[in-house]
Amino acid sequence: MIRAIVFDLDNTLTDFMKMKEAAIRGAIDAMIDAGFALPREQLRERVRTIYDERGLEFQNVFDELLEREFGEVDPKILAAGIVGYRRARESELVLYPHAQLVLLELLKRGIRLGVVSDAPRLQVWMRLCALGLQHVFDAVVTFDDTGERKPAAAPFREVLRRLDVGPHEAIMIGDWAERDVVGGKSLGMTTVFARYGDTFDTKVSGADHDIDDLLELIGIIDRIHGASPGSAKPTEG
């Protein structure tokens, strides 16, 4: 009996990489307009280099960019970059198709919902609030809550504890096989690979099920509960 579903957030419920790229483009255009005299592609490469070094959640990327280029922070260019980034981010931060429908159906069935993310706590909650999901989840576990990243057991154990369910009563769904699938499986959770959000061209996920649309999750639950097979696609091989 499945009593809880645990979601990864980025590239599982929302297309994080699409949003990030759009936000970076918005920031670059705004900084150039404010007087940053570098070609657009060159500026984009410098921003990507900082993210590669510091991680995609690094919050002072434009400060560091300006310090590297000019030895100091130009407040006008910095402000333009931040505003441009936020405007583009807000317009591009949307749920994947059928995500809202699936979440509502799960709530209607009385299934408890959780999130496990490697992102910092504030960033996770900002994204959930922007998506209108701040009241949907019974448990939200971020990197700050355990100090460990997936596939370590701690984040998964913590979300199961907060949801008050055992691992065999929960499904873990995520787009990163080496983290979401491996971590969930290690505790005995049923695992679902969100192939639609995969950015690594994963050939074999190792999950119990691969899906190309969130709507297929309902079919998986129905099959586990002995109802109809729905549209679930078991992992091949």
What are the functions of these language-model segments?
Residues 2-104, 122:
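N-terminal helical cap/lid subdomain that shapes the substrate entry/recognition surface
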Residues 1-5, 17-18, 68, 78, ...:
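Asp-based, Mg2+/Mn2+-dependent phosphohydrolase catalytic module
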